[in-house]
């Protein structure tokens, strides 16, 4: 794999200026796709960091399981069903990253070796003989950063059919200690290193943070949409003559982030309103998955929801109001009557105290009365967190709950203010959540 190793490693890990630190981060990423013993379709995450790959894979696996499978008991998965689900999901993500000028790529062990064999042949004779005496798991454990990358190869395929056969054939590899990294490299090489560099705002910023080990937004977006752009808004923007790339079409799986609730960013509708009711949920340090089985949640937006979205484009700081001078622009954007006399009449009605601002709530009630959300008012939801220590009784299982979406008025029911609720309120401002467990699901 020498022809791409240096470029690939710099793209993922950056310049390795501190070998000890990089090895520490690398070790946190060395795990396979392993299913929970307590939840047949849930993947486990052992250390902080690889959620940037595991959570998107989990989300697309749920999409396949809930909306393409004929299983009645979706939470019960046999080993054969797990194999089919995982391989189908990995293929879908690689396929979404495919660039028509390249080929489908898989990164695997050199000459088809198992990780145990690779570990035994890769070191000095003393090391190898020592490893032979230990379990195969320990042998894999001994593979460090340099040795691992010397023992992998790139394989190219011309058709999706060939790719699928190879992914199925290598099923055991995806579950071994390096499965997540081998899959990540497969996606990156399928997309093309230059294509990725051209999408990232700062090409010198690695996809995996060299200090904390977290995946970048570009990496998350690549796995979700097939494009490694650095931003989560709709379309491209220009700032000081520099083009900032965003999301260009509705995603199959969505993305919500606590960072929006904290006003660090604004997620666009292409990620916030995906094709399927499954969302990656980001905290400051971790990624989890929020999902439902009700497709009504992703029905086309109602006029009131469109109005809310348009209003908020004129309220970039999410204050809940706009200057009254912007009312005409908002009404024109929504194809409402916008002649000057009517605009002045509405200004006086919506701002009777003459404060010079128009509040979102009264605006929606004036022009879109009795129009709630186009989705259901109450629906069953689930939350997934791959870290054992973040789950009840340290068992990776889906947490079930009921979501209630209120109207514009002050909700009569108010549950606790929690990180997951604050995050979901960026999508459903008046959502309330009731979980079946004693404690609220953790985003970390």
Swiss-Prot record:
Pfam families, per the entry: MINDY-3_4_CD
Q: Provide the alphabetized UniProt keywords.
A: Apoptosis, Hydrolase, Nucleus, Phosphoprotein, Protease, Thiol protease, Ubl conjugation pathway
Signal peptide per UniProt = none
Record GO terms (molecular function): cysteine-type deubiquitinase activity; K48-linked deubiquitinase activity
Query: Any one Gene Ontology biological process term?
Result: apoptotic process
Per the UniProt entry, the Enzyme Commission number(s) are 3.4.19.12
Residue positions of the active site: 51 (nucleophile), 286 (proton acceptor)
Q: Which domain of life is it from?
A: Eukaryota
Reactions listed under catalytic activity: Thiol-dependent hydrolysis of ester, thioester, amide, peptide and isopeptide bonds formed by the C-terminal Gly of ubiquitin (a 76-residue protein attached to proteins as an intracellular targeting signal)
Its localization reads: Nucleus
Record-level GO cellular component terms: nuclear membrane; nucleoplasm
Q: Which family does it belong to?
A: Belongs to the MINDY deubiquitinase family. FAM188 subfamily.
| Assembly and binders | Interacts with COPS5.
What protein name is recorded for this chain? Ubiquitin carboxyl-terminal hydrolase MINDY-3
Query: Which source organism?
Result: Mus musculus (Mouse)
Q: Which gene encodes it?
A: Mindy3
């Amino acid at each position: 794999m020498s022809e791409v190793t240096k470029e690939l490693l710099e793209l993922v890990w950056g310049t390795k200026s501190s070998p000890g630190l990089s090895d520490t981060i690398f070790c946190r990423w060395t795990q396979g796709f392993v299913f929970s013993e307590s939840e047949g379709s849930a993947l486990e995450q052992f250390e902080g960091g690889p959620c940037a790959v595991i959570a998107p894979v989990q989300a697309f696996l749920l999409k396949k399981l809930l909306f393409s499978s004929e299983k009645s008991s979706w939470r019960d998965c046999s080993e054969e069903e797990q194999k089919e689900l995982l391989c189908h999901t990995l293929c879908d993500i690689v396929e979404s990253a495919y660039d028509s000028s390249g080929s489908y790529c898989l990164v695997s062990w050199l000459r088809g070796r198992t990780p145990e064999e690779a570990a035994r042949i890769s070191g000095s004779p003393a090391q190898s003989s020592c490893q032979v005496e230990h379990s195969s798991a320990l042998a894999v454990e001994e593979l460090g950063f340099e040795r691992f990358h010397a023992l992998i190869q790139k394989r190219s395929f011309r058709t999706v059919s060939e790719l699928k056969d190879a992914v199925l054939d290598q099923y055991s590899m995806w579950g071994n200690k390096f499965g997540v990294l081998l899959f990540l490299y497969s996606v990156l090489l399928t997309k093309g290193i230059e294509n990725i560099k051209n999408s990232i705002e700062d090409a010198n910023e690695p996809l995996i943070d060299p200090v904390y080990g977290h995946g970048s937004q570009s990496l998350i977006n690549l796995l979700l949409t097939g494009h490694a752009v650095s931003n989560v808004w709709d379309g491209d923007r220009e700032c000081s003559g520099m083009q900032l790339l965003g999301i260009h079409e509705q995603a199959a799986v969505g993305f919500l982030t606590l960072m929006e609730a904290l006003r660090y960013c604004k997620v666009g509708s292409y990620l916030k309103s995906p094709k399927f009711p499954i969302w990656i949920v980001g905290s400051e340090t971790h990624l989890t998955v929020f999902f439902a089985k009700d497709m009504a949640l992703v029905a086309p937006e109602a006029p009131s929801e469109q109005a809310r979205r348009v209003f908020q484009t004129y309220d970039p700081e999410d204050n809940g109001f706009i200057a009254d001078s912007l009312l005409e622009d908002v009404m024109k954007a929504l194809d409402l009557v916008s002649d000057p006399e009517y605009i002045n009449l509405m200004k006086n009605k919506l701002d009777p105290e003459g404060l010079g601002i128009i509040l979102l709530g009264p605006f929606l009630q004036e022009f879109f009365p009795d129009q709630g959300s186009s989705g259901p008012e109450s629906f069953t939801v689930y939350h997934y967190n791959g870290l054992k220590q973040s789950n009840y009784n340290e068992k990776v299982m889906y947490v079930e709950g009921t979501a209630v979406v209120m109207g514009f008025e002050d909700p009569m029911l108010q549950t606790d203010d929690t990180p997951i609720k604050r995050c979901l309120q960026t999508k459903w401002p008046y959502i309330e959540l009731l979980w079946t467990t004693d404690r609220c699901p953790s985003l970390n």
